[in-house]
Amino acid sequence: MEKITASVRLKKTRGERNRLLKEGKVPGVMYGKNIEPVAVAVNARELESLVERGLKLFELSVEGKTQRVLVKELQHHPVTGKLIHVDFQVVESGRKIRQLVPVELYGEPAGVKAGGILEHGLSEVTVECLPEDLPEFIEADVSKLEVGDCLRVKDLELPPGVRVIEDPESIIALISAPRDYVEEEEETTTSAPEATA
């Protein structure tokens, strides 16, 4: 399991936060069940490297003590997009967690080959599982979807030990008819002669 080191922040002022950001560090907080919240700071590049690879569960070493943590929330600057704060949740072995996991679509839908349009629904789903079973992402095969078909949460193939906490009927992806096809159908319906008695 990946591991990064954090230092304890003694000050929690705006000036201290700005100083840390200038030094290439990200201020954050580590918390968990029966654990007092601890203000920490981590190397921005190390954290961004893990996050970019989809890793949200790793070990965090604070003053020589290592905890397994989950990245619960990331805050970015609204203008620059720079990472400015992180929340770490300490996880316990044997205790299930809930976490947002991205859904990655793969395959070229049959309906798209026929001229349809692939539309995206949920791009992330909340899953419940043990920390060691947490997937980086969930793959969804859309290659068999025809025009008018959709892939729902209940259709997802999940790894062992993982359960999705979402409405089973929520749409992940659907194949809609091309606009000109819809317009042609509407014109045909409108121009069809009415049956006379």
Swiss-Prot record:
Q: List the disulfide bonds.
A: none
What does the record give as the function of this protein?
This is one of the proteins that binds to the 5S RNA in the ribosome where it forms part of the central protuberance.
Q: Enumerate the transmembrane spans.
A: none
Query: Subunit composition?
Result: Part of the 50S ribosomal subunit; part of the 5S rRNA/L5/L18/L25 subcomplex. Contacts the 5S rRNA. Binds to the 5S rRNA independently of L5 and L18.
Source organism, top-level taxon: Bacteria
List the InterPro entries hit by this protein, alphabetically: Rbsml_bL25/Gln-tRNA_synth_N (IPR020056), Ribosomal_bL25/Gln-tRNA_synth (IPR011035), Ribosomal_bL25_b-dom (IPR020057), Ribosomal_bL25_C (IPR037121), Ribosomal_bL25_long (IPR001021), Ribosomal_L25_dom (IPR029751), Ribosomal_uL5_bac-type (IPR020930)
Asked whether the UniProt record includes Cytoplasm among its keywords, one would answer no
Example GO biological process term?
Answer: translation
**Per the similarity annotation, which family is this?**
Belongs to the bacterial ribosomal protein bL25 family. CTC subfamily.
Q: Does the keyword Ribonucleoprotein apply?
A: yes
Q: Which SUPFAM superfamilies match?
A: Ribosomal protein L25-like (SSF50715)
Name a GO molecular-function annotation: structural constituent of ribosome
Report the protein name in the record.
Large ribosomal subunit protein bL25
Q: Which UniProt keywords apply?
A: Ribonucleoprotein, Ribosomal protein, RNA-binding, rRNA-binding
Q: Name one GO cellular component term.
A: cytosolic large ribosomal subunit
A Pfam family this chain is assigned to: Ribosomal_L25p
